[in-house]
């Protein structure tokens, strides 16, 4: 049996880029909660003792941007300089302007257009992916890397591993075999964890705790064997972390946000963007389409692409590829997709309820992945029943 290795990575909520994603989405939540018609394009950057939010926002909402920044940093665990940022004493800069009227008239006619007439907020192409190798219909390498990162945060916040600090990265290499286009995980080849820690803990303690409290609860025993390689804080020291260790910026973890390198990516980031930005809403609807195809039994593995022009409601193209795993030809699956999914931005907002903010809805998406999550707020993860006829044997 011929096999191959594939690797996916993830980062914790305390990684500086992910901190920025979460702040941008916390701002989006605050705007949409008060004004569902808010137009938000919020970026965040951070470095030692500094967080800046900037971008274009048109909203009737009354938003305290500085409070959102400080609350988000504090909730992650950035409460003192020694962990990389002090939420209560860092400098916060806000540079927010209104959305360009040129963009506004092209996209929604200054709110005069009906939902089905609303144009895409920009050009671009987005991809959705699904695979039957996990219950989440997501790639195993990505699922494990993501869950390891989430587990590190859990055991840090519940006090199981008091030496843990907010910043950290994970990476998992899985050995696969290709079964006529479907991906079959065989074993976990390598587990890599690099996590921020306090001064007092030893490397041996770190390795022991990571195996016991992070790896064992996350990675099923059937995937681990005596040949599995573990790199646990291989640099030997990771005390300086968060924005003190590295600058952070919204939108720099787009592969972590999606499929861990599987499928494809159009390049557009998600966080801080309202649903007229098809970088986000388009990627959400094609994930639902790909997931529904696999869940319905039409294929074992699937990628869906959609593309847009700014100001134009109808997509320019829709593409489906099942990697040879389809029960019927891809051209027939494409017809089913077009019949069952409305790719117009205004209708995606309605059908996926994307104008609803508040309660940390979009903030939740900004750490540990936008897809494969079991959460009612992730409406794009709901499988849509697809009707199709089995070909005669």
From Swiss-Prot:
Stated family: Belongs to the AdoMet synthase family.
Residues binding Mg(2+), per UniProt: 9
Protein name, as recorded: S-adenosylmethionine synthase
Alphabetic keyword roster: ATP-binding, Cobalt, Cytoplasm, Magnesium, Metal-binding, Nucleotide-binding, One-carbon metabolism, Potassium, Transferase
InterPro entries the UniProt entry points to: ADOMET_SYNTHASE_CS, S-AdoMet_synt_C, S-AdoMet_synt_central, S-AdoMet_synt_N, S-AdoMet_synthetase, S-AdoMet_synthetase_sfam
Location in the cell: Cytoplasm
Source organism of this protein record: Solanum palustre (Non-tuber-performing potato)
Domain of life: Eukaryota
NCBIfam families, sorted: metK (TIGR01034)
Residues the record lists as binding L-methionine: 56, 99, 246, 277
SUBUNIT field: Homotetramer.
Residues noted as binding K(+) in the record, renumbered to the chain: 43
Cofactor (UniProt): Mn(2+); Mg(2+); Co(2+); K(+)
Known catalytic reactions: L-methionine + ATP + H2O = S-adenosyl-L-methionine + phosphate + diphosphate
Cofactor note: Binds 2 divalent ions per subunit. The metal ions interact primarily with the substrate. Can utilize magnesium, manganese or cobalt (in vitro). Binds 1 potassium ion per subunit. The potassium ion interacts primarily with the substrate.
């Amino acid at each position: 049996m011929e096999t191959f290795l594939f690797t996916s990575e993830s980062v914790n909520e305390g990684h500086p880029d992910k901190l920025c994603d979460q702040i941008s989405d916390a701002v989006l939540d605050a705007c949409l909660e008060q004004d569902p018609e808010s137009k938000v394009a919020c970026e965040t950057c951070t470095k030692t003792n500094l967080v800046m939010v900037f971008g274009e926002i048109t909203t009737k909402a009354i938003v305290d941007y500085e409070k959102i920044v400080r609350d988000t940093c504090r909730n992650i665990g950035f409460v003192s300089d020694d962990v990389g940022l002090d939420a209560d004493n860092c400098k916060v800069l806000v540079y927010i302007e209104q959305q360009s009227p040129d963009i506004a008239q092209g996209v929604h006619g200054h709110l005069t257009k009906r939902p089905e007439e609303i144009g895409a907020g920009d050009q671009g192409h987005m991809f959705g992916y699904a695979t039957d190798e996990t219950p989440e219909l997501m790639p195993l390498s990505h699922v494990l890397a993501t869950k390891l990162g989430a587990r590190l945060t859990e055991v840090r916040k519940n006090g199981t591993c008091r030496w843990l600090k907010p910043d950290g990265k994970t990476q998992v290499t899985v050995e696969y075999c290709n079964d006529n286009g479907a991906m079959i995980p065989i074993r976990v080849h390598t587990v890599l964890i690099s996590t921020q820690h306090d001064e007092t803990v030893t490397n041996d303690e770190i390795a022991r705790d990571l195996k016991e409290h992070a790896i064992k609860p996350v990675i099923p025993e059937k995937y681990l064997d005596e040949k599995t390689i573990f790199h646990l804080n291989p640099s030997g020291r990771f005390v300086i972390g968060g924005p003190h260790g590295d600058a952070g910026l919204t939108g720099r973890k787009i592969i972590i946000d999606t499929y861990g390198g599987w499928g494809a990516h159009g390049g557009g980031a998600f966080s801080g963007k309202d649903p007229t930005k098809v970088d986000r809403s388009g990627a959400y609807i094609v994930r639902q389409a790909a997931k529904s195809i696999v869940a319905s039994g039409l294929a074992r593995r699937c990628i869906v692409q959609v593309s847009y022009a700014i100001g134009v409601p109808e997509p320019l193209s829709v593409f489906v590829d099942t990697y040879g795993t389809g029960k019927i030809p891809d051209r027939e699956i494409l017809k089913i997709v077009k019949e069952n999914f409305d790719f117009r931005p205004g209708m995606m907002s309605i059908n996926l309820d994307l104008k609803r903010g508040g309660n940390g809805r979009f903030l939740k998406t900004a750490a540990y992945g936008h897809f494969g999550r079991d959460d009612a707020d992730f409406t794009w993860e709901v499988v849509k029943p697809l009707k199709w006829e089995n070909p005669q044997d």
